[in-house]
Amino acid sequence: MQLTLNEKRLLLELVKTETTTPEEMGTILDRPADSVIQYGGLLSQKGLAQVDRAVTTTLTLTEEGTQYLKEGLPERQLYDSFSESASIADLNTHPHAKIGLGWMKRLGWVKIEAGNVIKTGDPAPSPIELALKNPDAAPADIKKDLLKRGLVTEEESVRYTITITDEGKKLAAAGITLTQETGTLTADQISSGAWKDLSLRRYDITKHPRPVWPGKIHPYQRMIDEMRRILLDMGFTELHGSIIQGAFWNFDALFQPQDHPAREMQDTFHLAGKQELPVGWEKVRDMHESGGETSSTGWGGKWDPEKAKATVLRTHTTSLSIQHLAAHPEPPVKAFCIGRVYRREAIDPTHLPEFEQLEGIVMDTHVNFRNLLGYLKEFYGRMGFESVRFRPGYFPYTEPSVEPEVYIEGLGWVELGGAGIFREEVTAPWGITCPVLAWGLGVSRVAMLRMGLTDLRELYQSDIDWVRNVPVVQGGRC
């Protein structure tokens, strides 16, 4: 029977102890415990040893659990805060009212009558209170409550033991010779023939090595970098700017009326302070009120400069595009921006209050709507979406407008962003006379499709296993 040097050494030591742990044997053999487990596994395959794996689960108090162990659970603190009875309104001022009241009632410590909370007696410590002192000794149902309330974390520890078998003892008794083995050969050993006198270590090429997890860029960041590289390769220049913008650039410069619902507090994050209006703001005012020097009639009414001075977290990256165009009104311009934007969205599987958006613009003398479709098809194609089609759309600051759709196997046609040519009301105040092609898309939506996710929140969770297992290459082409 062929044994490696380390298998032989382990087997001889097992004769002395019969049963051992990888940690103990690692000290004797001067090898890491993981290596000893590997040697034991090889002996086990040959019937010379047995490797047992025992998993132990332990509960550890969280920071919140430690605090409640010292100060008492919310229900105990709330119970101790009043005498015989108290109104629900009074108890609601207590910092633990929301959690504590429900648990007091569930444990039978109180009853509720006519809007008052009445104690039913002096309660003994609850099972959860007792379990905080020694979580591991608690019954299974109480452990579940501790975990559900976030008072403990569950940790698994694995312990291995290695035991010599009767076959192992027989082989050791028959005599084992320890011979130094060579696992690698030098060029000199091969050319001189010295390798013939060496004891070469045998390798089983059918065995899979243990996985190695090197550093890896987050899949979402990697896709953002891929988008950036594609646009740079297509000749675009990247724009950068602050997430804090004046309402003028975020709304007014894009010909969004000042009474538009998107500007309300429930849709936009407003910040304290005012922003100065830029040089040339009067032409934007005239455009809103009467259409300025164009054929447009504007929105009518009086444009309020104070509303335009409001400070907001940008709701889109188009605010950077129009600022860049205002500073560079002469063609050609070919630029893009990938950045985070903020909206007051209710959190659900497809909406978050902050997300990444990609914005692109092209301004030149002879560009037209067909050029826009060509740019979009080329970009999505390089992202790996080979089937692209376009549907008419509507967006406030582009005309004509279009919605690109890509075909996803199993989902059908999926809309990915919006595009169009900037309206005259957007470009004229800055002296721009050439067509401006513009498009934008939600980066996270593309990521969900590329990675097969159903919940947007998965992109931002600290799930190391998911990061490890997501393929590095996911179908894009350059």
Swiss-Prot record:
GO terms for cellular component: cytoplasm. It comes from the Archaea. Keywords: Aminoacyl-tRNA synthetase, ATP-binding, Cytoplasm, Ligase, Magnesium, Metal-binding, Nucleotide-binding, Protein biosynthesis. The keyword Metal-binding applies. Pfam families: tRNA-synt_2d (PF01409). It is an enzyme of class 6 (ligase). Its main location: cytoplasm. Disulfide bonds: none annotated. This is Phenylalanine--tRNA ligase alpha subunit. It comes from Methanospirillum hungatei JF-1 (strain ATCC 27890 / DSM 864 / NBRC 100397 / JF-1). The lineage of its organism: Archaea, Methanobacteriati, Methanobacteriota, Stenosarchaea group, Methanomicrobia.
